[in-house]
Regions:
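Charge-rich, low-complexity intrinsically disordered linkers/tails
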Residues: 2-6, 10, 14-24, 34, ...
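Long, intrinsically disordered low-complexity tandem-repeat segments
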Residues: 25-50
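Short terminal or interdomain "cap/linker" segment that borders an active site or interface and mediates
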Residues: 59-60, 372-436
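Internal, well-ordered interaction modules that form the hydrophobic cores of assembly/scaffold domains
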Residues: 334-403
Length: 459
């Protein structure tokens, strides 16, 4: 560019030449608008403070003692409740837990907990699976203790009372196996035709005979072949196929049980051990899928039921009596070289049946996985094929079996059990030979179990 060429002027230079721009900013500063105002308010960072004296304003505001609150000015940002993200899943779970916790009654809690129907593993306590007791212990977080708890009430003293009870049992045995003429049973139904009437006849007679020693039995309710069910979750698995493929779902279980008869009482039985008591027996941990047991998945209405409605006054369990079906027939298991599975299947039956019944009782009182029990729930069971009797006691210490609730849960449920004992050897000529008094003693001890608050009247 030559020196004689005209110089091009930009817009800013033209505005400055006309007196526009900076004089206006100066005028605004004179009126208290712009950077001096920001500095006076004490708002901004080091850059604003350097330009307009903000640092001095901040120090003066702190000296003035202005209060700064930690309350958020805006509501928190929540994930979408319909998204597929993990945050959205956590939000849905939290909202569901809050709805259940806010439910006013146990019936509403059970309705919400059983509302969603998904595929679940259906457990039948009498099963043909190998090592079924270890699987059932894992599903229910139950530790098995051989023998019976020491806190059971003592049996009756030898005397006229015990002799009378023995005559009641012998008469019931003769009634079903000697006096009555019965038609030829169907195939594999011979024992069922004899044992079911025996239990139905023996239990009411023992209850009525012992009602004078245990007033709780006088206010009890006897159910014949009730439906008992319990629904819960334990563990997690990934959905393998379908429109929900890849989702992580809890492993759901449903126990369907039908005892021969059961006794319900209006008062809860006393605990066998304290709630937080630690026992040396461990709960087996199985890392295989339940389908390897094998268990099969079905989808139908979830059920939590003790054999009566929630409003029934006798809402606590006392003793169940189970018939050992053909799946537990000793002769068949010995013939199939499965003699070692006889006691295993009996233990599995006791653990599964008592967990379902006792867990449903706790659910009737408003407890569930996120609101764990505050007191133990106790039930008893007797499993018999008419000749051999097995006795089990169960104490429910926790319902927190989900992955979320079981992270720091040190409690475990406890089941005590005996090996099967023979009641008698044979019946010949209207006489019961080889009668085992120990079995009768345990039957009486089970039926005499009661809370300490119940008044005892010995007739």
């Amino acid at each position: 560019m030559t020196s004689g060429a005209p110089r091009r002027v930009g817009p800013r230079m033209a505005a400055a030449a006309r007196g526009v721009g900076r004089p206006l900013v100066a005028a605004a500063a004179a009126r208290g608008v712009g950077r001096p105002l920001v500095a006076a308010r004490g708002v901004g960072g080091p850059l604003v403070a350097a330009r307009g004296g903000g640092r001095a304003a901040l120090s003066s505001a702190a000296a003035a003692g202005e209060l700064v609150t930690a309350t958020a000015c805006y509501p928190p940002l929540l994930p979408s409740s319909t998204a597929k993200s993990k945050a959205a899943k956590r939000r849905r779970e939290e909202e569901f837990y809050q709805r259940v916790l806010a439910s006013p009654s146990a019936a509403d809690k059970i309705r919400l907990l059983t509302k969603l129907q998904r595929l679940k593993y259906v457990i039948h306590p009498q099963t043909v699976g190998v090592a079924a007791d270890r699987w059932f212990q894992h599903f229910t977080k139950t530790a098995f203790v051989p023998g019976l708890p020491a806190s059971l009430p003592p049996g009756p003293d030898p005397g006229p009372g015990l002799t009378e009870l023995k005559s009641v049992v012998c008469e019931a045995l003769l009634q079903e196996q000697f006096y009555l003429k019965k038609r030829r049973p169907f195939l594999y139904r011979e024992r069922e035709q004899t044992v079911l009437p025996l239990i139905g006849n023996l239990v009411p007679r023992l209850v009525s005979s012992l009602a004078g020693r245990n007033p709780l039995l006088g206010r009890s309710t006897l159910d014949r072949e009730p439906q008992v069910g319990f629904y819960w979750s334990r563990g997690e698995q990934t959905v393998p196929r379908g429109h929900r493929k890849g989702r992580v779902d809890p492993i759901r279980f449903q126990i369907e049980d039908k005892p021969c008869c059961q006794i319900r009482v209006p008062q809860q039985l006393p605990e066998f051990v304290p709630l937080e008591n630690s026992i040396p027996e461990n709960v087996p941990v199985i890392h295989l899928e339940p389908s390897r047991f094998p268990l099969f998945q079905r989808q139908y209405e979830n059920n939590i039921f003790i054999g009566s409605k929630i409003d029934d006054h006798a809402c606590y369990g006392h003793t169940q009596f189970h018939f050992a079906s053909e799946k537990l027939r000793r002769e068949k298991l010995v013939k199939d070289n499965l003699a070692d599975q006889i006691e295993v299947r009996l233990r599995a039956n006791g653990i599964g049946s008592l967990f379902a019944w006792t867990g449903a009782q706790a659910a009737y009182q408003g407890f569930w996985s996120e609101a764990d029990v505050t007191r133990p729930f106790v039930s008893q069971a007797v499993i018999t094929d008419g000749i051999y009797f097995s006795f089990f006691c169960y104490q429910l210490n926790t319902l927190a079996l989900t992955v979320r609730a079981d992270q720091h849960n040190l409690r475990k449920n406890i089941c005590w059990g005996t090996e099967s004992m023979c009641l008698y050897e044979t019946i010949e000529g209207g006489d019961v030979k080889g009668f085992n008094d120990e079995v009768l003693d345990l039957l009486v001890r089970f039926l005499l179990n009661r809370p300490e608050a119940v008044e005892t009247k010995i007739s």
